[in-house]
Swiss-Prot record:
<dbReference type="GO" id="GO:0030174">
    <property type="term" value="P:regulation of DNA-templated DNA replication initiation"/>
</dbReference>
<dbReference type="GO" id="GO:0071162">
    <property type="term" value="C:CMG complex"/>
</dbReference>
<dbReference type="GO" id="GO:0005524">
    <property type="term" value="F:ATP binding"/>
</dbReference>
<keyword id="KW-0539">Nucleus</keyword>
<dbReference type="GO" id="GO:0003688">
    <property type="term" value="F:DNA replication origin binding"/>
</dbReference>
<dbReference type="InterPro" id="IPR027925">
    <property type="entry name" value="MCM_N"/>
</dbReference>
<dbReference type="Pfam" id="PF21933">
    <property type="entry name" value="MCM5_C"/>
</dbReference>
<dbReference type="InterPro" id="IPR031327">
    <property type="entry name" value="MCM"/>
</dbReference>
<dbReference type="InterPro" id="IPR008048">
    <property type="entry name" value="MCM5"/>
</dbReference>
<feature type="binding site">
    <location>
        <position position="372"/>
    </location>
    <ligand>
        <name>ADP</name>
    </ligand>
</feature>
<keyword id="KW-0067">ATP-binding</keyword>
<dbReference type="Pfam" id="PF17207">
    <property type="entry name" value="MCM_OB"/>
</dbReference>
<dbReference type="InterPro" id="IPR033762">
    <property type="entry name" value="MCM_OB"/>
</dbReference>
<dbReference type="InterPro" id="IPR027417">
    <property type="entry name" value="P-loop_NTPase"/>
</dbReference>
<dbReference type="GO" id="GO:0016887">
    <property type="term" value="F:ATP hydrolysis activity"/>
</dbReference>
<dbReference type="InterPro" id="IPR041562">
    <property type="entry name" value="MCM_lid"/>
</dbReference>
<dbReference type="GO" id="GO:0044786">
    <property type="term" value="P:cell cycle DNA replication"/>
</dbReference>
């Protein structure tokens, strides 16, 4: 196969020089270098009317004067100047990129003269390449593309520390002290094969032994290099397959340009290196011709923050005009809500809340350096069969960056970050988890209630501070996880039981308070609704089409995905003065309980909201403004945000299911629970036991509600004061 990256075999009869090249080959190289030099000198942009500028000549001069010894060349510019040169660079990049760098060094020498004293020696120039061609996929790389230029997108999941690699080495014989200098080492991850014999012949001296040479470190010329691990994008992974990885090699100015979690598009040379040796004897013969693939990077484009795969730069002017018209529609909010999972009937408020989550609020950086998150977190609790998982699956496809995980199959390290040992350097490196890979997008966590409590605690920091702090194996760092969390969970009893109240939920208050909206999804028995739902499901199954049965005026999935990415990239609304005043007044009313008193005439219930919930309403208002591409969130947006908060979190709190969450408990309930607990402790002493049925009946005769009695019993069991015995019929007092 042509173009194999060999080991740089050293010929002992050509000491001190590079590989001998024939006159024809040398002349061809000189000719190609001259054409590259002409391209860098003469390529210009502009018109006769506006005037011409020499693009690369001016760039070289500007970068060199700033001490940046690199230049970025666009392949399209090279192809328009000389198509043969671009073809050479695509098909044989290893040889021709070196010629291009030598040509760039000569042009830089010309344009920077005269240089100041002490800087007479011209520095080497690194040439980086970029292209607007459509990227390939890691899975599509085959042996035919070996040693060709390739362009692939993906996510950086690991990065090693920057190390040094020799480009020119000097070697010396241990026996006769013969020194050979300035030996070129091939770029990339391949090493250099030392000569086995010393050919220096001196009269009266015995021949030097085998393997006499060693490297003189002080006389070597080194460059920085770094290896990265690239994982293919989640949307490019076929269903049911594992995402594939590729090792990347970066050197010089390409080092330290990316961190784990960055979405990048790589331009590089598809290369091979020798596989690691097997330890078992006799098996080396099997893998003698097998090589491991890697990519030698020659250009990196990092996707802009928060826009991900549907980068705003890829949006055409026609699409931008269409988005402006879409945002100007008076019913854009309803249109977007209808476009979310159109195959699912009903759940209009949940779809509107998901629309707010997809667009997100505005992230704020305060003067003291602290940040306020702009992403909206949403939790759906309730009965099975209410399309919670289907909504999560749709959001994963609809979001510009979406990662879907299930609670039981997710560990703390898999969600946040893990530390592992690099097989090459044996140093510890860090690999980002789901919440790092979803930076700028949405993490969908299904079966949230099935997660282990230890794993659920790991995402506390990621949900509120939007960072993940790691202190393991000598690595102390912080990764960004600026993503929304959309979670779905079932109740403890499978179906929602209104009589059980808080017992339906087995979540800590600390995790519940981090969700901006909490929806309780109930499968209510309503004949008219059941008839409509059954008809809708039958239409979906019979016609296998959702568009015919869904409402008019919705946006298709691809347009919606691009529109969300465009709004997130271009718009960052703030609350208007009138909206802020209105929200402040309503917040005071809700804190005092006046609004609850107006809504409920039978009894006065005080359900205060805290500053965390106030910030949630601000974020929802900003997302409604962002949906319309407005610079400010208006009073109408605040009204709708308050309504969404009312039908989600406040209604859940009213049902008693969120008591204990950030003050979501009435004063009367707390007093009643403490009275029941005191009487229960008086009823039976420590070490005694009593029938559970009889004690519940005694309290029911005293007109206490049954759910309050069960709540006290569960609280005492959780604290370890009582326990069940004899098939859960008897209560035994421990302390």
């Amino acid at each position: 196969m042509s173009g194999f990256d060999d080991l740089g075999v050293y010929y002992s009869d050509s000491f001190g020089g590079e590989q001998q090249v024939g006159d024809d080959g040398q002349a061809k190289k000189s000719q190609l270098k001259k054409r590259f030099r002409e391209f860098l000198r003469q390529y210009r942009i502009g018109t006769d009317r506006t005037g011409f500028t020499f693009k690369y000549r001016d760039e070289l001069k500007r970068h060199y004067n700033l001490g940046e010894y690199w230049i970025e060349v666009e392949m399209e510019d090279l192809a328009s100047f000389d198509e043969d040169l671009a073809d050479y660079l695509y098909k044989q990049p290893t040889e021709h990129l070196q010629l291009l760098e030598e040509a760039a060094q000569e042009v830089a020498d010309e344009v920077t003269r005269p240089r100041p004293a002490g800087e007479e020696t011209i520095q080497e120039i690194q040439v980086m390449l970029r292209s607007d061609a459509n990227p390939a996929n890691i899975r599509s790389l085959k042996s035919e593309q070996m040693s060709h230029l390739v362009k692939i997108p993906g996510i950086i999941i690991a990065a090693t520390a920057v190390r040094a690699k020799a480009t020119k080495i000097s070697i010396q014989c241990r026996s006769c002290r013969n020194t050979i200098g300035n030996i070129a080492v091939r770029p990339g991850l391949e090493g250099y094969a030392m000569p086995r014999k010393c050919n220096t012949e001196q009269a009266g001296r015995p021949n030097c032994p085998l393997d006499p040479y060693f490297i003189i470190p002080d006389k070597c010329k080194c460059v920085d290099f770094q290896t990265l691990k690239l994982q293919e994008s989640p949307d490019a992974v076929p269903h049911g397959e594992l995402p594939r990885h590729m090792q990347l090699y970066c050197d010089r100015y390409l080092c330290d340009k990316v961190v784990p979690g960055n979405r990048v598009t790589i331009m590089g040379i598809y290369s091979i290196r020798k596989s690691g040796k097997t330890s078992t004897k006799g098996r080396d013969r099997v893998g003698v011709g097998i090589r491991s693939s890697y990519i030698r990077v020659v250009g990196i484009q990092v996707d802009t923050e928060g826009t991900g795969r549907s980068a705003a730069g890829a949006i055409t002017p026609q699409e931008e005009e269409e988005f402006r018209r879409l945002a100007a529609k008076p019913d854009i909010y309803e249109t977007v809500a209808k476009s979310i999972a159109p195959s699912i009937y009903g759940s209009s408020d949940i779809k509107k809340a998901i629309a707010c989550l997809l667009f997100g609020g505005s992230r704020k950086r305060l003067p003291d350096g602290l940040t306020r998150r702009g992403d909206v977190n949403l939790l759906m609790l309730g009965d099975p069969g209410t399309a919670k998982s289907q909504l999560l699956k749709f959001v994963e496809r609809c979001s510009p960056i979406g990662v879907y995980t299930s609670g039981k199959g997710s560990s703390a390290a898999g969600l946040t970050a893990s530390v592992m040992r690099d097989p090459v350097s044996r140093n510890f490196i860090m690999e980002g988890g789901a919440m790092v890979l979803a930076d700028g997008g949405v993490v969908c966590i299904d079966e949230f209630d099935k997660m282990r409590e230890d794993d659920r605690v790991a995402i506390h920091e990621a949900m509120e501070q939007q960072t993940i702090s790691i202190a393991k194996a000598g690595i102390t760092t912080t990764l960004n996880s600026r993503c929304s969390v959309l979670a779905a969970a079932n109740s403890v009893y499978g179906r929602w039981d209104d009589t059980k109240g808080e017992e339906n939920i087995d979540f800590m208050p600390t995790i519940l308070s981090r969700f901006d909206m909490i929806f309780i999804v109930k499968d209510e028995h309503n004949e008219q609704r059941d008839m409509t739902l059954a008809k809708h499901v039958m239409n979906v199954h019979l016609s296998a089409r959702t568009q015919s049965s869904s409402v008019e005026g919705e946006v298709d999935l691809n347009t919606l995905k691009k529109y969300i990415a465009y709004c997130r990239a271009k718009c960052g609304p703030r609350l208007s003065a009138e909206a802020a005043e209105k929200l402040k007044n309503r917040y005071i009313l809700m804190r005092s309980g006046a609004r609850e008193h107006e809504r409920e005439t039978e009894k006065r219930s005080s359900i205060p909201i805290t500053v965390r919930q106030l910030e949630a309403i601000v974020r929802i208002s900003e997302s409604l403004g962002k949906m319309k591409l407005q610079p400010f969130a208006t009073e109408t947006d605040v009204e709708e945000a308050l309504r969404l908060f009312q039908v989600s979190t406040l209604d859940a709190a009213m049902s008693g299911s969120l008591s204990g969450v950030e003050g979501f408990t009435t004063q009367e309930d707390q007093e009643m629970l403490s009275r029941i607990e005191k009487q229960m402790k008086k009823r039976f002493a420590i070490g005694s036991q009593v029938s559970e049925h009889s004690i519940i009946q005694d309290f029911l005769k005293q007109k206490y509600p049954e759910h309050a009695i069960h709540k006290v019993l569960s609280l005492m069991m959780r604290r370890g004061e009582i326990q069940h015995r004899l098939q859960r019929k008897v209560l035994y007092r421990i302390k």
